Amino acid sequence: MFYNVVKEYPDIIVDYSVSRFEKFGSAVTLVAQIEFTDHSVRYIKDYLFVDGTRKYSYHWQDAYGQLRARWDNSPHHKHIVTFPHHKHESGKTSPSHERNLRDILEVIRQSL
């Protein structure tokens, strides 16, 4: 799935790599990196567990290593209406409906 989605965005993606992919039954681990046309980078950690639960972090930083945005579902920020899903941006945490690679690539496409 990762490769199929990445191929849909040749206008914004210049390079990508998968540093870890493991599948054990229905459990999946994906650790990857995507470089964009402005040299910003997105670091991906996505874990699907056997019980169907998922843990993810999509960290996007500029070419100088400064955070542009991070989407994750770490179970803190209980006050956010989309808890546990949220977005870190400009020093603030906000609700997030983007929860997968394609949704977040669309946000990045609009920003580039």
Predicted features by range, described:
Residues 1-46, 50:
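Negatively charged, low-complexity tracts enriched in Asp/Glu with abundant Ser/Thr
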Residues 10, 75, 109-112:
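Generic secondary-structure transition motif, activating predominantly at the C-termini of alpha-helices
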Residues 43-47, 68-74, 97:
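Short amphipathic beta-strand/extended segments with alternating polar/hydrophobic composition
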Residues 54-80:
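Mid-chain, well-packed structural core segment of small domains
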Residues 78-92:
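Short helix/strand-capping connector loops at secondary-structure junctions
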Residues 90-112:
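Well-ordered alpha/beta subsegment
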